Amino acid sequence: MINPISFRPGPVTFWTTLIYLALLIPIVIINEKTPAAPKTAEPFKGVNLTEAWLDLTTITRAYHPYNSKFNEEVRRYLLEKVETILEENGASWVSDGQMTTVKDGKSAAVTVFDDNVSNSTFVMGKSNGTTFTRTDSINNAAYFEGTNILVYIRGKEDDEGEWWEADYAHGMRRNAKGLTLVNAHYDSVSTGFGATDDGMGVVTALQVLKYFTAPGHQPQRGIVVMLNNGEEDWLYGAHALGQHKLNPFIHTFLNLEGAGAGGRAIVFRATDREVMAAYARTSHPFGTVIASDAFGLGFISSGTDYSVLVDAYGQRGIDLAFFKPRARYHTNQDDTRHTSKGSLWHMLSAAIHTTKQFSGDTGNTFIGQRPDKAHGKVANGRSSNGVWFDLFGKSFVLFGLRGMFAWSLTLLIATPLVLVGITWLLRNLDKDYFFTSTVKTKEHPEYEAVPIGGWKGFFRFPFALGVAVFFTISSALLMNKVNPLIVYSSRYSVWVMMVSIFYFSFWMIMRGANFVRPSALHRGYANLWLFVFGWIVLVAVTALEDRRRIAAGYIFVFLESAIFLSCLISFVELLAVPRKSSYALQVQEDYDGQEHDHNGYQGFRDSTDEPSLRARAESSASAASPPSPTVAQEPSKSKAPAGTTNGLSTAPSVAAHSSQPQPAPTTPIPGRSSGAPSTASRDENESEDDDEPTERTPLVGGNGTNDRGRTTFATTYRRSITALVHGARKMEEDGEPYDHEQEWSGHLPSWAWFFQFLLLGPFMIILAAQTGLMLTDAVYQTGSDGSKLITPYLIIFVFTVLLILPLTPFIHRVTHHIPVFLLVVFIVTLTYNLIAFPFSANNRYKTFFGQYIDVATGDNKVCYTGIEEYVRPIIAELPSASGREVTCGKSLRRGSTISTCCFDGSAVPPKLGSEDDNGLPEDSYADLITINATRSTKRGDSSRTTARIEITADNTKSCFLQFKKPVSALAIENGSGWDDRFGQYPEDGVGLVRLWHREFGKTWVVNAEWKGSETRKEYDENDGTVICMWSDANTPGTIPALDEALQFVPSWAAVTKFSEGLVEGRKAFKIV
């Protein structure tokens, strides 16, 4: 019966293919399928999924950016919804400013903050101005008036009363255990309905409020549910939180966000291990620390409120977000039609569980002095770095980075020592076959060294790996050169292409090499090379763990651990083979026995006709295994003696049973001195010797002149026969070598490979496949945003290698059927990937829209930004662009592959004012922006000049103020002052100020100051430009250019906003 796990082609092909398919198929299904929502509307008390979905459809009926009328309607709806929830739950609540004490002298369970007061002025970093006011890099600042809604749910252990007021109970402890924030933003972009960005976050936050205000669900520590406004343009709502009186008491947070349009909500990033412990036991965990480290290293530049909460306020928490498909992100397909209740439930269930864990932690996990002692940040204890990842979206692995560092260091130091120790032991036991090519025996030191096949196949693995890597990376580079965006719609085709070529090319080299020179050490050498390469990578991973606190290398830590154990098995299984000296002795004795048999039947033969000991050993090592012993028949001169196979005797020779003595061999054994006569002289005497033996004739053949070249009866007859018989019995007991491999390999356990593959394979396949797919999903549709087009291909390449590596030590045993099939698959997918159009109606290419007007001259341009190759065909479909010149240039705000293409937009003029205009003459926009800029010099200080600039814009909440010369000081009237938590005022001044009001048409008053300005030339340098934004496209005809785009662009294209405003109107001013 065939061993079902023997190291033979059939079992190896079957088990490896089965395990790969059994793991990869579920991983792909899980990656594509969102866990189903509960069938009941109320999965548990205090949560109503149907109600949440209805709220979502209500707030996503129209675009609702901060600078739109519908945004204000959404805000009113949310305030009413909060009140309805509290009333239905019977919770005692008050609005901020009312008395917190209710009946029976108890404090209200809930306080609602309708925040129309908080505002923030802060530095934003550098930019190159706006679209049509390009300058050298200048410092940006912002002034923003918030409209956040905050609901405080009092915890059981919270202080009573209005403890958050600065003058409340002076000297008393003020809610030292802190609060947990649940945050979501209710504004959308101007071109998206915001179902997942961030409508689902908003309705999830409402259900969190509903759950924790339901009877019996009061949290241990207080919870703040915040619905913030203004996140989309520059995280403004989170900046406004910094001015709220609850902010200093928030220790932990859960930020609910959307950077895709459905699917599962992933842990985008997290601050530490302790906050992840709160998330870890959700019903469907999803995420990996790799994503968090990618943010930390700057590989992902997308911003969420998490950045402000952590970097500015020092809070500890989690960013929970939707992240795919990116093609629908910020477009009109971010609606309820293109998402699901399953996605909503995935976020909602995780949010309630995590919030419950945060608020239920009454220990000191999130309390205490900060280790960095940073000024202005909340004292929320000491955190530790963590490592985390999910398995199949059902379980979650979480442990400390410090522990992984110790583990990595142990692997680096201990594992080489263990392998060196095993090698030393094998050498002492005379079983170190890996690094020994030949061996001599003490019994016959004069013999030629016996080859045992060590080092055979040693360099195959790195060569095969190099070839496979070359072909795979070449396919990636070819895609990037010929059709770089095919991954945008066909990422699985790219995955299959790379996996197929890597598998086939690696198999081709390894199988071919093993066919030409079979080696039983092939598998062991592959494991050894894997260990060496893994150890080198682990050095870099360990350094990053220690110096940069990067945990993303956990895959390589697990991989090297598995490789070490597999490598250890390859060394340990050598204990089952005979000693090298024993094997060599057997080969030499078999040789002697064959010499005896040949001469016993055939007389003396020419020494040149007899193969050397090395040739016999090599023949023995490469021939098929012997059959069962049979009774010897008299052989002819041209055939090997019966009872021998592959140069090794399997039955006693006839000489052992003959009543007559047989002639001894005269052929010299290699390595001995020989006095054998020449062929001619031997032929002359042969008949004479055979016919008449004398008293000088030796007992076993030959004659007196050949003494020195002969063995005695004792060394040739008895020892060879015993060894041959023993060898035959031993071969029957221990099995046969496989397909011309070294004969001693028949003693190796044929099942060891299976356990090696179980160590290397399943867990690494899971990690590589699901992590590779997750990272691919995160980036495969970012090329249209300006990201590097090669990035998704490099990710797929790296994880293709990691995916197939566990198979590589055994791949030479796989039958040709699988690799040949994959070669065909590679050819098909390569052809498709090279010629297919990269976009479709379900995977639309995103182009960025903007319209730009000079309100003084009426100059009007419509611009589309993206990859020029695809932007021009899009523009060609627009009626207003027909017959007009289209000019393109590199975009400064996007990547190097992105261009901005513009044409005259006079055919589609926007209607921006409060009242519709008819005809729109050249100067019809002149009254949209009113600027009054006056200068004054400080008394007694002629080196400084100040200016008061008043800006009023019709039907908008947003204008930018850009100066020719940066201002050395800046203040907004009625503003809260400069918030240095976001950075000190720049020494080289501020060149651009972004101004945001919470009301339409309200006037901004900006006080600016310059150094110098004593000459007319310097006065002129103090002039500038005002750029105002209009973003409300809900009423058809308001922005006809956008209406046209949504109607006429090809089905494979989508339109999204380029910047804060769909329309930007600019007007220059002089300070007088």
UniProtKB/Swiss-Prot annotation:
Entry membrane topology: Multi-pass membrane protein
Keywords recorded for this protein, A-Z: Glycoprotein, Hydrolase, Membrane, Metal-binding, Metalloprotease, Protease, Transmembrane, Transmembrane helix, Vacuole, Zinc
Biased composition (Polar residues): 643-661
Cytoplasmic side: 1-9, 426-457, 514-523, 576-747, 811-817
EC number in record: 3.4.-.-
GO biological process, one term: proteolysis
Keyword Glycosyltransferase in annotation: no
GO CC annotation terms, alphabetical: vacuolar membrane
Positions of the record's site feature: Transition state stabilizer: 329
Residue numbers annotated as active site: 231 (proton acceptor)
Subcellular location: Vacuole membrane
Molecular function as annotated in GO: metal ion binding; metalloexopeptidase activity
Chain segments carrying region Disordered: 593-713
Enzyme superclass (EC): hydrolase
Positions of transmembrane segments: 10-30, 405-425, 458-478, 493-513, 524-544, 555-575, 748-768, 790-810, 818-838
Described function: May be involved in vacuolar sorting and osmoregulation.
Protein family per UniProt: Belongs to the peptidase M28 family.
Name under which the protein is recorded: Vacuolar membrane protease
Native organism taxonomy: Eukaryota, Fungi, Dikarya, Ascomycota, Pezizomycotina
